[in-house]
A protein has these predicted regions:
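Flexible phosphate-sensing "switch/lid" loops adjacent to ATP/NTP-binding sites
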Residues: 1-293, 297-300, 317-320, 343-344, ...
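Catalytic nucleophile serine of serine hydrolases
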Residues: 305
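Conserved catalytic-site region of short-chain dehydrogenase/reductase
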Residues: 310
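Conserved P-loop NTPase catalytic core
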Residues: 321-348, 354
Length: 471
């Protein structure tokens, strides 16, 4: 909305916890939520927009990334004690953006009234106080209990924090907003804060930050071609497959139960934040045996990043890079490659050309973000030829109808999707790849951003929001 009104806008979230991440043009890692926000604002994603990224690697531990660089693994208690030391990094990133952009829109994390976590807060009201920012408090009515959410949050805040709240917003409402009016009046009386609008539940298709459940698991294969993405426990960067979901020929299913696997036309093994644990899960759940049966039946399989590593012969972690302990596991054995984890993380934004049939000649753009090095056995055909800043190298592997590579975002280009359909899927069902034109994924995203902006603008008192910012 601010960008549509002519302002140069930057998103900002001091600390984000997510499995889906992105590599900027200068090789820094950041959360995808701020990438999507930057794209909506029409600006280049910048690691300053998300200076701290936490990538969960277990139920109690995360990889800590600061200014796009890995600092190491930390458990939750240790990070909570240590995070106050990162406030200078957060403020430096914010101040730099504030000097460069007309407006900086800050996203908090969770609830600002988690009183057990308020000490040394660097992401919610503590950050708002540090940068002297007004606050809009939004409640999700789709989850129920929105009046209690908003009233309880305001009541638990300190007086100096309550003074920062410029207004309340009800989000994701379904039905007749007039029925809410009595409750809104009472909420304003109880909190002393104006309700700036009720945003309806809008049918837009914008990448999820992490949760598959609300959007992706509902997709069923009622279309011509059945594509299965294996739903790994630590699945990451599932946005790799968003362009396939919007294609009229493809039904994309996310499957964790072998009973739901069926006989798909193509299987995608996605990235993961914990390759070793998810490889064990494949084995123990019966998914490995099921995938091997599908391979024997001629079903093509593509592994991306961690999925590529699992398709190989072995995965070794001699230094305990992933979980803090040395391990070596047998892979699925479908690609003649071996992976060894090291402490160094690869982060690049290369351009590439597919080398191996049936993808040969397809131009790819994407990014690499992974730990470990994969070595191909002698005579193995690499999948792509990469070039970045004048340096050239090969990546990935192919063996029969199994493919693997480290490159995320390979389906973002419509040319790649068309090649994918023509070369593999349509060969199985004899359906012309041109039966349904593939829209540019970027153009599709822009339409969704505009639809969301139009719906939110119509629902909110935008003038009051501008006034709260002194604009």
């Amino acid at each position: 909305i601010f960008a549509q009104d002519g302002y140069r806008v930057a998103p900002f979230k001091s600390q984000n916890m997510a499995l889906n991440s992105f590599v900027t043009r200068n090789g820094a890692e950041m959360g995808r939520a701020q990438v999507v926000q930057a794209q909506a604002a029409g600006v280049e994603p910048d690691v300053r927009m998300n200076p701290i990224l936490l990538k969960p690697s277990s139920d109690t531990g995360s990889q800590v990334i600061v200014h796009g660089e890995v600092w190491g693994q930390m458990d939750a208690a240790s990070y909570f004690r240590w995070k106050k030391n990162l406030l200078p990094d957060v403020l430096a990133a914010y101040d730099s953006l504030a000097e460069e952009y007309d407006l900086v829109v800050i996203e908090g994390a969770g609830s600002p009234a988690e009183i057990n976590l308020k000490a040394d807060d660097i992401v919610n009201m503590g950050l708002a106080r540090a940068v002297d920012a007004p606050v809009l408090l939004a409640g999700d009515i789709d989850r129920g209990g929105v009046f209690a959410q908003l009233y309880g949050t305001v009541a638990l805040l300190e007086e100096v924090e309550r003074a920062r709240i410029a207004g309340l917003i009800i989000n994701k409402f379904r039905g007749d907003a007039a029925l809410l009016r009595p409750g809104l009046v009472q909420l304003e009386q109880l909190t002393g804060k104006q309700v700036l609008g009720v945003v309806p539940y809008l049918p837009v298709d914008i990448d999820d930050e992490d949760s598959l459940a609300p959007r992706l698991s509902a997709r069923q294969t009622e279309k011509a071609l059945d594509v299965v993405v294996v739903r790994l426990p630590h699945l990451s960067n599932f946005t790799d497959f968003t362009p396939l979901e919007s294609h009229s020929l493809l039904g994309v299913r996310y499957v964790a139960d072998i009973r739901a696997l069926g006989l798909p036309d193509f299987v995608l093994l996605p990235g993961t934040k914990n390759t070793m644990d998810d490889l064990l899960w494949l084995r123990q759940s019966g998914m490995e045996a099921a995938l091997l049966r599908l391979h024997g039946a001629g079903v093509p399989i593509l592994g991306v990043c961690g999925g590529y590593q699992m398709l190989g012969e072995t995965v070794d972690d001699p230094e305990g890079t992933e979980s803090g302990r040395s391990r070596s596991l047998r892979g699925l054995g479908l690609l003649p490659v071996r992976t060894v984890f090291t402490g160094e993380k690869t982060r690049t934004r290369p351009a590439a050309v597919a080398l191996a049939e049936p993808f040969a000649g397809a131009r790819l753009e994407g990014y690499e973000i992974h730990m470990g090095r994969t070595v191909l056995s002698k005579g193995t055909v690499p999948l792509v030829y990469m070039e970045e800043e004048g340096e050239q190298r090969q990546d990935g592997a192919q063996s029969d109808h199994v493919y693997g590579c480290y490159m995320h975002g390979i389906f973002d280009m419509s040319e790649t999707v068309k090649t994918f359909l023509a070369a593999v899927l349509c060969a199985r069902r004899c359906i012309p790849a041109t039966a349904s034109p593939t829209i540019s994924h970027r153009a599709y995203e822009e339409r969704q951003f505009d639809a969301l902006a139009d719906g939110v603008r119509a629902a909110l008192d935008v003038d009051a929001i501008y006034q709260s910012m002194g604009v």
